A protein has these predicted regions:
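Basic, flexible Lys/Arg- and Gly-enriched helix-loop patches that mediate nucleic-acid binding at interfaces
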Residues: 44
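Charge-biased low-complexity segments
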Residues: 47-53, 80, 87
Length: 112
């Protein structure tokens, strides 16, 4: 009998060539970053503006629905002002401070 094993999801922030930040989710960060860089399977935004750097990555800890949790974090990061995005990129503790009232976000660890 096949076990239902929850996948690990990653939430990431890329810096685009135009200086903007792009946030996304994936189960394979290396594959997805390569897709963004080569523009063949990247998002429309990164295909249009190019990608410079991988700035930060968060990995889901074990939980019942990691995809849903990663999607929620992606949404919350996209809603942040640029200065807050820069803070969570530069300072690992800033993530906990900014999201301290969201207990479910304790299910992430900084991966990169």
């Amino acid at each position: 009998m096949k076990k239902n094993v929850a996948k690990t999801y990653y939430v990431y922030i890329l810096e685009c060539a135009n200086g903007a930040y792009y946030t996304g989710i994936t189960t394979d960060i290396e594959r997805r970053f390569t897709e963004h860089k080569t523009k063949n399977k990247g998002a429309k935004y990164t295909s249009a503006f190019g990608v410079k750097n991988l700035m930060a990555v968060w990995k889901t800890k074990k939980c019942d629905n990691p995809k849903s949790l990663a999607s929620k974090l992606e949404y919350r990061i996209k809603a942040l002002e640029r200065k807050d995005k820069e803070e969570i990129i530069a300072n690992k503790k800033a993530f906990k401070i900014i999201f301290m009232n969201n207990f479910e976000f304790n299910s992430f660890i900084r991966f990169f």
